[in-house]
Amino acid sequence: MYSKYPAFFLNKNIKSSSGVQFSNVVKIPSAIESLYRGDNNLTGIIFLLPTLITGVFCQNFPEVVDIEQIRLHKLTNLSNDFHMVSMSEDPQIALDWGNGCFITIDPVSFSDYIVDVHATFSENQLNLPGRMEREKEHVALAVPFCSIKKITIHNKELANPFYLSIPQENHEAKMELNTLYGELISLLRKKYTQEVDEKEEQIALRTYAIRYLDFYAKFCGCDNPFDKTIAQLSELYPEFMSNFLQSSHFSSKTGLMKEIVVNSLDNLFKEHPYTKSIDASYIYRVKESTTCYEDDWAKPVYD
């Protein structure tokens, strides 16, 4: 057993979203306009072609996100087996987490999927150590690439050409992105927990990605970055595209970005660093963890 927590039974407190459910957690306040995620391997992930479609995601996809999952994320230190995508309200925290590298995130478009860690602990009559309180942390299972405003690499800010600003009042866009988000989480959960048929996976990925491109076409209008060529994007966003072209691999650089993406869809999971090496031994491994009941660093909170 990798968790000592009691089994969770579905009840009326569960609020369902496609792809993931939430129970007894507190979502991000609507007043927060930006979150920040630090990652010391940011440059190895953020400029990859697959990341344009999958965004930034974790390696743990519970069907129900509740206080037990938040505990495992926050107070488990030995592996990434239970970690979600961490974000902070404080850019300095993200700067420290990422050793100078972080992304600035617009949480509005996927706020239904973001959990306020500290408010959730308080709601469940739990306290965090002071050193954790300072982190002002929020978590999600994934961050859509369209919600990333900019990328900071050692004091240099790069605008994200694929950022799509969605106002709070644009309920149609938020609902469509929610549907896409749920589809992505379901795809990732299946990838991480089941041995999948490669052909079926490719079809599902292609279906999701084309719907994602259609989402841009519907809500970007004439500013849709996927309707531009690499040359056009390089002229508008030279630093981002320079990193993108160095990091990504595709057979042809001609045509519109959406055509380049569609031609690369069969390799999305094959080329992503997180998913390319997943096999049966990984799926059925025994997860390693030090929980809050065993970790001397965290245990005093519960004594």
From Swiss-Prot:
Keywords from the named record: Glycosyltransferase, NAD, Nucleotidyltransferase, Secreted, Transferase, Virulence
GO molecular function: glycosyltransferase activity; nucleotidyltransferase activity
GO-annotated cellular components: extracellular region
Summary of the knockout phenotype: Deletion of the gene has no effect on bacterial replication in the amoeba A.castellani.
Its EC number(s): 2.4.2.31
Signal peptide (UniProt feature, chain positions): none
Subcellular location: Secreted
Catalytic activity from the UniProt record: L-arginyl-[protein] + NAD(+) = N(omega)-(ADP-D-ribosyl)-L-arginyl-[protein] + nicotinamide + H(+)
pH dependence: Optimum pH is 6.0.
Function comment: ADP-ribosyltransferase that targets a specific class of NAD(+)-dependent glutamate dehydrogenase (GDH) enzymes found in fungi and protists, including many natural hosts of Legionella. Acts by targeting a conserved arginine residue in the NAD(+)-binding pocket of GDH, thereby blocking oxidative deamination of glutamate. Lart1 may target amoeba GDH to prevent a conserved stress response. In vitro, acts on Glud2 from the amoeba Dictyostelium discoideum (DdGluD2) and yeast Gdh2p but does not act on human or Legionella GDH homologs.
Protein name (database record): NAD(+)--arginine ADP-ribosyltransferase Lart1
Organism: Legionella pneumophila subsp. pneumophila (strain Philadelphia 1 / ATCC 33152 / DSM 7513)
Gene: Lart1
